[in-house]
Amino acid sequence: YIGAGAFGYSTCKTIEIPASVTRLDKEALHGDFTSITFAEGSKLESIGDRAFRGCDITSLILPSTVKSLGHKVFQACDSLVSVEIPASVTEIQTDTFDEYFDADANEGSGNVTFAEGSIFKLQDGVLYDSENLIRVLDWQENVVVPEGIKYIGADAFNAYSTQTPNNMETLKSITLPESLVSIGKNAFQACKALESITIPKNVSEIGGGAFSNCSSLATAEILGPVKELTGTTGVFLGCAALKNVTLPDTLTNIGT
């Protein structure tokens, strides 16, 4: 493997990772590399947190053996315009692509392609696997979540956690599918342009802070058998415009 920070702040510009390397530890290639390639027959399986931090590469093709990607793998890779993810990848973190899809990055930055057969897909700028909405990568004004998605993960549209504050004003509407059963904590925190939300009939769990600080949210309709609206952060905390709320008769607890 290549250990943590092995090439940190190196003046090297090009590197070919030997086929024998199975793991890149955190910040393993942190530096000014303009070219990163992988030897034929690569056995690489794991890429650690911020592994390519600050690199000046414009494109990257990961080997077909890679299984997992850590946190903020492409952090501050402002020249990177193309990443190809193989179908072998089965583990991606919520923030794997954070600070790669950056409002301050070079124009065109943020093109991720998943190989045919991958369990992951990008649709309208949102990253999914077969059942989960993982994270928004490229913010849009209107999002329709496809049928079949059961879970919206924590921080999925959290405008505070994406490192790009301008996104707070982007999302104006989102349509949720009937298949949805759970919304994670802080899922839509600080989506300040969101004006209304209808939570479908099969949703039984809404995490704390899910819609907190959605300052334009005026209408919220909860149709599912939710029993609690609790958490360390209130589900609708800071929703100053909220005037119309429909709650289910299954609700037994509101608070923290």
Label the model's feature ranges.
Residues 3-6, 25-28, 48-51, 70-73, ...:
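Consensus positions within tandem repeat domains that build extended binding/scaffold surfaces
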Residues 131-137:
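Eukaryote-biased recognition of intrinsically disordered, low-complexity regulatory segments
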Residues 1, 10-23, 32-46, 55-68, ...:
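Structural signature of tandem-repeat unit edges
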